[in-house]
Amino acid sequence: YHGYDIDTNKRITISTWQSLYKLDRKFFKDYGAVIGDEAHLFKAVSLTKIMTKLTDCKYRIGLTGTLDDSKTHKLVLQGLFGMVNKVVSTAELIDRKQLAQLKVVCLNLKYNEIESKKVKDVKYFEELEYITSSNPRNKYIRNLALALKGNTLLLFQLVEKHGEILFKLIKEKANQKRKVFFVFGGTDTDDREQIRAITEREENAIIVASYGTFSTGINIRNLHNIVFSSPTKSPIRVLQSIGRGLRLSLIHISEPTRQSL
């Protein structure tokens, strides 16, 4: 990754895709196998470039827990890695007690008629900006995050217009001893790892994080609640985000009461 020499005499190279996709074809000529983690991301142009440069690579393995329903996405991945082989489902792993029990709760917030008419005919992004700037809605999310027992991951989409606001609201009302973290694209990688490690040792921490930083690839074994504070239309993002909460935890957590919100 950044800061390390790409030339090596080792048999195995572990790298971020950002460090590789601009390299010439000759760099890849000696590799006979490639393993792509989070393979659902390989439809991106940069990752596709890497795979197409591996012309002499005989063994191609892609690993993912989520594929979207679009035929195009599936065909792109088949072209890069080969036919899809489903090894096991999430439901099976839950039944085997290798993943945590999952409960999805849909909280339907009602708006009055005047407020509803304001966004009746607007486009998606305008509606997104409207609901994320709603003070009553944000306070409800704050109260929800504070009422939930256990470690909570609260995901947002817009950093300045939503994430920073939620973090401030939660931080102001949280008990001084309760740890509240804010993570977005500008957060240093080492700081993110430190936050992850601290949360694994806590019992009631709150992480306010952007989808881009904490919805995929982050492994927190002691995470009990995930709150989607911003809507998202991506099935993969939803499933990957839920996956953050499927790691097993030894701590039993009770649910918040309606009165606590």
Segments and roles (model prediction):
Residues Y4-A33, A44-K49:
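Conserved helix/coil segment N-terminal to the catalytic DExD/H
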Residues D5-T8, V180-Y211:
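Conserved helicase ATPase core of P-loop NTP-dependent helicases/translocases
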Residues H40-K103:
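Post-DEXD/H (motif II) to motif III coupling segment of the RecA-like Helicase ATP-binding lobe
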Residues V122-L154, I165-K168:
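Conserved interdomain hinge at the start of the Helicase C-terminal
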Residues Q157-F184:
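Conserved helicase motor "Helicase C" RecA-like lobe of SF1/SF2 P-loop NTPases
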Residues I218-P231:
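A short beta-strand element within the Helicase C-terminal
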Residues S234-S249:
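Conserved SF2 helicase motif VI
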Residues I251-L261:
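Single conserved hydrophobic/aromatic residue that forms the stacking wall/gate
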